[in-house]
Amino acid sequence: MANLQNFSLEGKNAWITGASYGIGFNIAKAFVAAGIKNIIFNDINEAALERGLANYKEAGIENVHGYVCDVTDEVGVKALVDKIHAEVGQIDILVNNAGIIKRIPMHEMKRAEFQQVIDVDLVAPYIVSAAVIPEMMERREGKIINICSMMSELGRETVSAYAAAKGGLKMLTRNICSEYGEYNIQCNGIGPGYIATPQTAPLREKQPDGSRHPFDSFICAKTPAGRWLDPEELGGPAVFLASHASDAVNGHVLYVDGGILAYIGKQP
């Protein structure tokens, strides 16, 4: 039973980018349950930050430190890392969670729209990781978790930029492992499946005639689990990858998808 202590996050500080709500917020809650010392999060403007702080307060989570920062701003990120070190302490765990998606057919997508997705979903994890890694190297210890996607492996209509970014993030995860594993830094990814969030609620509502939304039917048929996943189901994998229990796991993407990637589908 003593090995269960390896899953403890007691005494650790975790920075989760874009964790005002959704996946990042639920990972933060799981970290708190595992004994984390401090949660650090950022959002892109003051209004979003205040909404996030209110969510943490409502959840009864203390020891939360929120900052305004655009993770695509390299200068701003470096300044924030210095501020975190001064005000909170070392960053033991980094979760690159902030992300966006634009659902536009590729031939209709403007280059600026494509570039924005790449900047937020791929370049930003590089910027933030590069700013945090030097101090981890000095301590010879650190955990980095990149929020990847099933689109790190699969394509789908209208998400060319997102799939390109998340595929790149999978390879960035592997390369951080390759480059910094000798410093006892573990970099892994989590690839969420289809998650039941307020944003996806309209896709899961019954239609006026009582039938299921076509996309709801599609996802449940494609998923061996036969259902959408709960955001809290990402918490356990995140705690594992943030804790000493995963010290021998590096460069891996853990797909929490209910089995979609393993499933070819039922025969008609």
For every predicted segment, state its role.
Residues 105-106, 113-118, 215, 219:
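Substrate-binding pocket helix/loop in short-chain dehydrogenase/reductase
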